[in-house]
Curated annotation (Swiss-Prot):
It comes from the Eukaryota. PROSITE patterns: BTB, MATH. GO terms for biological process: protein catabolic process. Belongs to the Tdpoz family. This is TD and POZ domain-containing protein 1-like. It comes from Mus musculus (Mouse). PANTHER family: SPECKLE-TYPE POZ PROTEIN. Residues 19-149 form the MATH domain. Residues 188-255 form the BTB domain.
Length: 365
């Protein structure tokens, strides 16, 4: 068969790859030795290209378990709550006193990361070797660890022929058209008053999307609908975000913890179940030691069970850090039942995310 033959059909598969490095310096390392399974956790970090995927490093100076008690253990941990796993390879090394890379060790395969799961090397470096070469590896009692992460992105299949641009999804056309009605106040039949600002809207759309608005329109006298409907306890920006969701099913600015704090009560009040789900997702993606307590209180107040579970798991995982915050100390006084639930969650040693996942990589000098 000739190698110069022409192919009638062909295609290709392309994969995107994202790479970034993180350097972590641990000062006064000799005072951080602790015992077996005692860990040190780095600050949260992410790549410049993808801030939504958050990571941290963990070091166990005296090993992650009894088997590795004579070694330094190091791990990479995924912190973000994502809908699908993250596939990544990684490499660790130490920076010595000369600025050189030492003990370069890489994962032999692409690892599948789920939320709170960690992968790494429980026998990264013999502790005796580290301490006996402290002048070189621990200059000024500082341990500097570097990690290079390579994330495998989506795969794209490229067809063999030019394709006519796809027709836009009719559902997107519908939401665009409804969004235009809202944005341009076209053919409106009611007026809503929010903190002194008037917004024109459509009763049929509001009634179809919100059982609260539906009940309001069913029971109000026709005469009263000629005057603006007062919306209480909402600021205009949050109201616009809620209305954008009512008309288009999207909440374009619902990506921060602060906006989610304001939108969740509105979604709960007006019976917008899907918007509550979007709020839960925003909270989960932005969970931190600082806001975990407030997130738990909101989840309990507005009966969002998924978010409450995530908040309890997060607090259990970072119990020592969370318990030092002023928010936690305030909750001890104001919401003792949530403190009890948090301790119950902490006591559940079966939580799968607490168990380190170890890969058997070989150290390479």
């Amino acid at each position: 068969m000739s190698e110069d033959m022409e192919f009638e059909n062909w295609g290709s598969t392309q994969s995107s790859v994202e790479k970034f490095c993180y350097k972590w310096t641990i000062s006064n390392f000799s005072f951080c030795m602790g015992g077996i399974q005692r860990r040190i956790t780095s600050p949260v970090f992410s790549s410049e290209e993808n801030k939504e995927v958050a990571w941290c490093l963990r070091v166990y100076p005296k090993g992650a378990d009894k088997e590795s008690k004579d070694y330094l253990s190091v791990y990479l941990v995924l912190l973000s709550h994502l809908q699908s796993p993250v596939w990544a390879k990684f490499k660790f090394w130490i920076i010595n006193s000369q600025g050189e890379k030492y003990q370069k060790t890489k994962s032999p395969i692409v690892e599948c990361f789920l939320t709170y799961e960690q992968s790494g090397f429980k026998k990264f470096l013999p502790r005796d070797l580290l301490l006996s070469h402290r002048n070189c590896l621990l200059p000024e009692d500082q341990l500097t660890i570097c990690c290079k992460v390579t994330i495998l992105g989506r795969k794209y299949n490229m067809p063999s022929q030019n394709i006519t641009p796809a027709i836009k999804d009719p559902r997107h056309l519908l939401t665009d058209d409804l969004g235009e009605l809202w944005e341009n106040s076209l053919f409106t039949d009611c007026c809503l008053l929010v903190a002194g600002h008037e917004f024109r809207a459509h009763k049929a759309i509001l009634a179809a999307r919100s059982p609260v608005f539906r009940a309001m329109f069913e029971h109000e006298m026709k005469e009263s609908l000629k005057t603006p409907i007062k919306i209480h306890n909402l600021n205009p920006q949050v109201f616009k975000e809620m209305m954008s969701f009512i008309y288009t099913g999207k909440a374009p600015y619902l990506h921060s913890h602060s906006m989610a704090c304001d939108v969740l009560p509105a979604a709960d009040k007006y019976g917008l179940v899907s918007l509550k789900v979007l709020c839960e997702d925003a909270f989960c993606r932005n969970l931190s030691v600082k806001n975990a307590t407030h997130t738990l209180i909101l989840a309990d107040l507005h009966s969002t069970e998924k978010l409450k579970t995530q908040a309890l798991d997060f607090i259990a995982y970072y119990a020592s850090e969370v318990c030092e915050t002023s928010e936690w100390k305030s909750m001890v006084e104001s919401h003792p039942h949530l403190v009890a639930e948090a301790f119950q969650s902490l006591a559940s040693a079966q939580c799968s995310f607490l168990e380190p996942k170890v890969i058997s990589g070989s150290n390479q000098l």
